[in-house]
Design a protein with these regions (language model features):
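Short loop/turn segments immediately following the C-termini of beta-strands
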Residues: 80-82, 135-138, 145, 155, ...
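A short loop-to-beta-strand structural motif that recurs across blades of beta-propeller domains
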Residues: 91-94, 148-151, 194-197, 253-257, ...
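N-terminal secretory signal peptides that target proteins for export/translocation
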Residues: 1-9
């Protein structure tokens, strides 16, 4: 969108490290594990073509093949609007390494330029060496939206294949991955028809094959919205341990859970209600945090509160509110986010700000003091 607690005792995620450089012949000391200043990077998401309104966010996972334009630990961001701020006209995925120089507006590195406009929050990276991104074009920047597609891109930013289907890929708005290397399940929220699909795919050297599509959930509210263009099912988060897929339904202002999502052969109606709270204000992006909690981005298109703009909300899978913070002092700034559990001390949490067309990336560490 482009418009200007108390919980159970368990690990919380707090920033603990800072970037320290080396000047002349002076050797920087080791970074203390209890450093106070967080390790944080904020950079523009605007590339040379002027695309704005960052939506999707994805870390490049461990095990991703070397030798391409992107590597493990890099961050990808998809842009929904063009330089004129027309919604559904953005065509770029930008990439950056959290250890590289901060990009000024207009200088963000372009990883992929699409011939299909309106790159959505549906952005993910497969360990087999491919990036998957959805697109949802608009009608002159407004409702109704068009069907769109999923595009598969190799590690050098080349388009490999385009997946379309009027039923199973009808406005691919967000996605979640269950990635097993040589095969994967891609869960897709369809904003145009209010459903969630699962794509079972084989991941090979040349792309995806043996693709089987199944609708696993239906009945989510779909409605036009001026600032957001359309409201419908958006964020998805998959818990591989339990087999549960969580769905952020923006129009319903609620989070639902689909049990046995990887094996379902028919569609449930919405799924089990997990979280419906005054803390929600049109949830968009949704991720499972390394501590087991869920994180969602409030888009402020529903239940808006000027005193609580652009918030990221943390809550448990049992529906208990934990914490919230705002990414911008204006409404409509929060959208895409990602969180990963890494083994090398890399940045592992990122969230975009649609108001400033930027992304903040953090290194968060587990602690048991909450």
């Amino acid at each position: 969108m482009k418009t200007k607690s108390k919980g159970r005792s368990r690990p919380a995620y707090v920033a603990v490290a800072m970037m320290i450089g080396v000047a002349a012949t002076v050797v920087a000391p080791a970074i203390a594990k209890d450093a106070f200043i967080p390790r944080l990077l904020n950079t523009s998401t605007v590339p040379s073509n002027g695309d704005v309104n960052p939506y999707g966010v994805a870390f490049v996972p461990e095990g991703f093949p070397e030798g391409g334009m992107i590597k493990t630990g890099d961050v990808l961001v998809s842009n929904f609007n063009d330089k004129g701020n027309t919604q559904g006209n953005g065509t770029t995925i930008i990439s950056f390494s959290p250890n590289s120089a901060v990009a000024a507006p207009g200088t963000a590195n372009t990883f992929f330029s699409s011939s299909l406009p309106g790159l959505s929050t549906a952005l993910g990276v497969l360990r087999g060496g491919f990036v998957v991104v959805g697109n949802v074009p608009t009608t002159g920047g407004a409702f109704p939206v068009m069907q769109g597609a999923l595009q598969v891109i190799d590690r050098n930013g080349n388009l490999v294949q385009t997946l379309t289907d009027a039923t199973f890929l009808d406005g691919p708005w967000d996605l979640a991955l269950d990635d097993h290397g040589t095969w994967a399940q891609i869960f897709v929220s369809n904003v145009a028809n209010g459903t969630v699909s699962r794509l079972d795919v084989t991941v090979g050297a040349k792309g995806l094959s043996n693709i089987k599509m199944t609708t696993i959930a239906k009945g989510y509210t779909v409605a036009p919205n001026g600032p957001a263009v359309i409201l419908g099912p958006t964020g998805l988060a998959f818990d591989a341990g339990s087999g549960t897929l969580y769905v952020a339904s923006t129009g319903d202002n609620s989070i639902y859970a689909i049990s046995n999502a990887g094996r379902a052969t028919s569609a449930v109606q919405l799924g089990r209600l997990v979280f419906a709270s005054s803390h929600l204000r049109g949830p968009l992006g949704l991720k499972l945090a390394p501590n087991g909690d869920l994180l969602t981005a409030n888009g402020d298109a529903v239940n808006a509160d000027p005193a609580h703009p652009s918030e990221i909300v943390e809550f448990t899978p049992w529906g208990h509110f934990v914490r919230e913070y705002n990414v911008d002092s204006s409404q409509g700034g929060a959208f895409g986010l990602d969180a990963v559990l890494d083994s090398d001390g890399r940045f592992n949490y990122a969230a975009v700000d649609d108001v400033t067309n930027s992304i903040s990336v953090y290194r968060l560490e587990a602690r048991d003091d909450r």
